[in-house]
Amino acid sequence: RYKVRTRTYVDSDLCFLEVKTNGSREATVKDRLRYRPDDADRLTPEGRDFVVERLVESETCAQEEARTGAGALAPVMDTTYRRTTLHLPADGARATFDTALTWEMLDSDGVRTNRRVLVDRRVVVETKNPSTASPTDRLLWARGHRPTNLSKYATGMAVLHEHLPTNKWHRTITRRLDACRHDRPARRGV
């Protein structure tokens, strides 16, 4: 299993092509290639070569399977949000806070369609700890917030494409997102 995405940091005008694969002990390994922001909605020949290289070197796929997989990749969704990151240097933990989460469906050429979902009045908090619970985790638990599984990609695909199964994300969608969800036409010219 692997994931390929581009990630753009609007404030710094940085863009990366990222390939996420499974490492030892179920750990996720993320490799990045500096990418042109203008290419964020497509896979360039250099980008395809990077994907193939990462899939082969991580032993995720054999060479031919990696080439076939990279050749079949096409844009499907644009996910945007505003992120704030806090670092707790004493224990090496970080916490990210994502607001204004928006998913927009793309066609196979990377062009926005008329399908867009905005999740309002919710903050997606992710804590990233080296080993044990951080002070942020304990504060969230004390306030009654329990961990919830969330893949922004899988959840976005499920809410944009009603025909896809929501199995794993059904509870998150119905209990956490539906009350704050606004289906809107996509922005034009963006």
For each predicted feature, which ranges?
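Phosphate-end processing signature that detects enzymes handling 5′-triphosphorylated RNA
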Residues: 1-190
